[in-house]
Amino acid sequence: MPTVKFHSLLTDFDVALYQAGKHFQLHHKMGSHVVEVDGQKGVCFSVWAPNAKRVSVTGDFNGWNPDAHILNPRWDSSGIWEGFIPGIGKGTVYKYHVKTIDGFGLDKGDPFAKLWETPPKTASVVWEFDYGWKDDQWIKARRESAFQPKPWSVYEVHPGSWKKIPKDGNRSLNFREMADELVPYVKEMGFTHVELMPVMEHPYFPSWGYQVTGYFAPTSRSGQPEDLMHFIDTCHEAGIGVLLDWVPSHFPGDMHGLYLFDGTHIYEYGDMRRGFHPDWNSYVFDYGRNEVRSFLISNALFWLELYHVDGLRVDAVASMLYHDYSRKEGEWIPNIYGGRENLEAISFLKDFNEAVSKEFPGVETIAEESTAFPAVTHPTFEGGLGFGQKWMMGWMHDSLSYFKRPPIFRRWHQNEITFSMVYAFSEKYMLPLSHDEVVHMKSSLLNKMPGDEWQKFANLRALFGHQWTHPGSQILFMGGELGQTSEWSHDLGVAWHLLEFEYHRGVQTWVKDLNHLYSSRKAMWYNAFSPKGYEWISGDDTENCVLAYLRKGEADDKVLLVICHFNTNMMAQYTVGVPYGGTWTEVLNSDDKKYGGSGIVNGALKANKEPSHGREHSITFQLPPLCLLVFEGENLPKTTKGNAKAEKEKTEQKTEKKAATHKASRAKKS
């Protein structure tokens, strides 16, 4: 009978950290690793199954015989089974055969596998990475610019349906083909980042990747691990950051996955009032179990370390934070204080964000969090969860509600489009128009818009303009940028043929120009999360559905004036106040003919010394229907700059004097 040699990659300290929930490098120790022991090449296996009666490795190398290669339980009662099997290596297909305490046999994939068979096959594959990265300068610059303001315009992509190949059975692009086609497109469109919906291995394609079984493996539907590395490397070479959707909120009940891994609930909560997710018929991680915390945070750092990912967007955070999420009374258990907050999940998220910030400065974590849970993007040392950004679901809901209304009724709902400014700076917000808004009979963004064909496109351009010029960053799901007419389908992909039509090309050009204006003007992004970057001119012209506001960068940056007009009336002369005189040049106008508009544009305007909206100067311009205009002011006059500098110096002197007085007072008391 073949034997398994005793060999371990784990030290006693590793095990202690693992059991304390503080081992965040488990991917280097657990799972399968090609090694050499006593001159023999083979594979070392290590798996956590604390309640198993026996664990063996089965595979194509032993005819899937569960009695052939039985692993050794560690002496320390850690629940880890391990051993070395000589004569096998990279590419070996395997599973763990787990005999439960009840005598049943379960065939499980490796939770730490770096590659899996292509679904519907479910076995793991021994893999060692072989890729030479070329993004040293990108990583260095990312680290050095950590915590500095930067532009964030994100293109959300479902890798399996961004583009299909009809001539080849309507198959999806693989990762290398995406590097050749998606990266140049994102670069041309001016997006700063691409966010991939989950690339981790998942058995059910229509889950879009959110039902993960292989947390440490990119889906083999799209190629090998090195192919994804090549895609990310190509993005970095093009100056594009890469974000991955990460799903620590739940996992599916597929029997080759984490559910009942050793016949008991070790990865999920044992009580289904906490452990079962009613929305997705999936299972909730036990965030109070230290081994699970080590597993999840190791997984997050794995993608950052070995795949050079620039950020993780954490899915369904709200479902993690509350025990009663989507549960009726009597279907959930309160925490130890009688509340509904999941204290273990809150603690886990803080640990996760601290680990990312410490190990990978410059990497962003983004929360999809739909409730009013406080301080999601505040530092953990201030009591926050520590995320870098949070999706602004309130803006999305209110804005879509507003834009769905026929313009004639919008005058009575101005609050829907302005309310977001009440709380815009309470968190660091990312404004989402994501995949969730264009599925499940919600219709496409274009078909949410009211009116005839021209009005639908004009409304859509105005919506995008408002999203881009609103404080915060923005994310747009693929297809939205060309005004897709149908809902997104993972089987059909983006309707690229629509670019044959003028209006659709116009929307695409509009998004491209929005991105280029956004990235090139610090006023659009430098103070994206600070009230310093935004100033109301007017928000109360409800009759005409007009908003006017300023976007501001640093002191020496040119100021942008944004005019939103969400009604169908054309006004030959509309006046708004401006903060100073000089020339105000129209740098963007969604009614330009190249975007599919009617062609009412303004060019450069000289400010008048006519007071308006509490300002000493004003400009008067043509205001097209259903549009967004952006004017750029001249640099602040030298006298204004000088006054600002003098005022700053005066304030600093006062502060220093006050501090000295306070210090002297304390010295006198002592």
Task: Give each language-model segment a name.
Residues V47, Y96, V157, V186, ...:
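Conserved, mostly hydrophobic/aromatic
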Residues F61-I80, D591-G614:
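Solvent-exposed beta-strand/loop surfaces of large extracellular or lumenal domains
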Residues K90-Y94, G603-G642:
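C-terminal beta-strand-rich structural cap/linker in extracellular carbohydrate-active enzymes
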Residues E117, W138-W152, H158-E341, F621, ...:
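Substrate-binding/active-site clefts of carbohydrate-active enzymes
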Residues P120, H308-D310, Y325-G493, L498, ...:
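Conserved alpha/beta catalytic core and glycan-binding cleft of carbohydrate-active enzymes
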